[in-house]
Design a protein with these regions (language model features):
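Short acidic-hydrophobic, aromatic-tinged amphipathic segments that line or gate anion-handling sites
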Residues: 151-152, 258-264
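Small-residue-centered hinge/linker elements
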Residues: 1-233, 238-242, 246, 272-307
Length: 307
């Protein structure tokens, strides 16, 4: 019985290992292969943030895998995203941009700022940018505020709460475990705060000062950009954030932060109002950022191979 149980365990482990390897290679394969996409004559570039936007590609082949769900997280570099928006500005096949920041992708505030500047430049080419979402997070709304029109689902919501920063301190835990952290930080280096969580129980005045400057900088860039795009006084935006006055869709509309409350199936009428042309079946053709980047890369490859 012992050897039978041991054999069953070994066989079961081998099968599980084999299946795990097959699944893992399948995920990697899906990340590295993409179906060719042909952009039609009247397409709308859809920025839905289903891809992670990253500064530069990672050399780690598993960096784009979400091991919690065992699914691929497709990535687009900031360079390719900016190149796509710049190309779309003068691409006669692209009618405009549908901004839909709900895809679950990851992007830093620095990346959002550069994307927003690229979208502002895109608008100067005379093409429309329409934003829609069921709910707007603060970063998503900051990006969406560059659009000609912003729409929100009637039962949706919005976050406009300001920027904050929190730190976790370990000194209390170390004291209970009788652990003494050996810290080397010269007295003159009081702003070198990375080691503070290991020997302090709260933020030092110096660190609080620099963190306050950092979050104020983030907030000022965001709020000033929204104020300019939406025609809302900066003091009003600060008041709305301080008082948490915007969370429901109707509140966002009342304060002028969105232009209307619509369900997504009503967006076709909005596109038509901005001169967009549908396909022969009456449906609009959308091409995602990842698909458009793949098309541009394929075009460059064809040009290089023909030379």
């Amino acid at each position: 019985m012992f050897f039978a149980g041991l054999l069953a365990f070994v066989v079961g482990s081998a099968v599980m290992l084999f299946l795990s390897v097959v699944i893992l290679f399948g995920i990697v394969g899906s990340m590295t292969s993409s179906e060719p996409v042909t952009v039609g004559e009247h397409a709308i570039l859809k920025l839905d943030f289903s891809e992670d936007l990253i500064e530069s590609p990672s050399s780690d082949p598993f960096a784009g895998i979400d091991f919690a769900t065992m699914t691929a997280r497709h990535q687009v570099t900031l360079y390719n995203a900016l190149r796509a928006i710049e190309t779309a500005k003068n691409d006669p096949r692209i009618q405009g941009i549908y901004l839909r920041p709900n895809g679950g992708g990851v992007a830093t505030y620095a990346i959002l700022e550069e994307l927003r500047e690229a979208l502002q430049d895109f608008r100067q080419g005379g093409k429309f940018i329409i934003a829609y979402n069921e709910t707007y997070g603060q970063g998503g709304y900051y990006l969406a505020s560059v659009a000609d029109k912003i729409y929100l689902e009637p039962h949706g919501g919005m976050q406009w709460t300001g920027v904050s920063s929190t730190l976790m301190f370990y000194k209390g835990l170390f004291d209970k475990l009788d652990i003494q952290a050996e810290i080397f930080r010269p007295t003159a280096c009081r702003y070198k705060s990375a080691v503070e969580p290991y020997f302090l129980s709260k933020m030092s005045n110096a660190n609080r000062e620099q963190m306050q400057l950092l979050v104020d900088s983030y907030w000022n860039v965001m709020a000033e950009a929204v104020a300019e795009s939406r025609g809302i006084e900066l003091s009003t935006l600060n008041r709305l954030a301080d008082g948490l006055e915007v969370s429901l869709a109707q509140e966002a509309l009342d304060h002028g932060m969105v232009d209307g409350l619509l369900f997504e199936d009503q967006m076709d009428d909005v596109f038509r109002e901005h001169g967009a042309v549908a396909k022969s079946d009456g449906q609009f053709e959308f091409v995602t950022l990842g698909q458009y980047v793949s098309q541009l890369n394929a075009d460059l490859k064809n040009i290089s191979s023909s030379q």
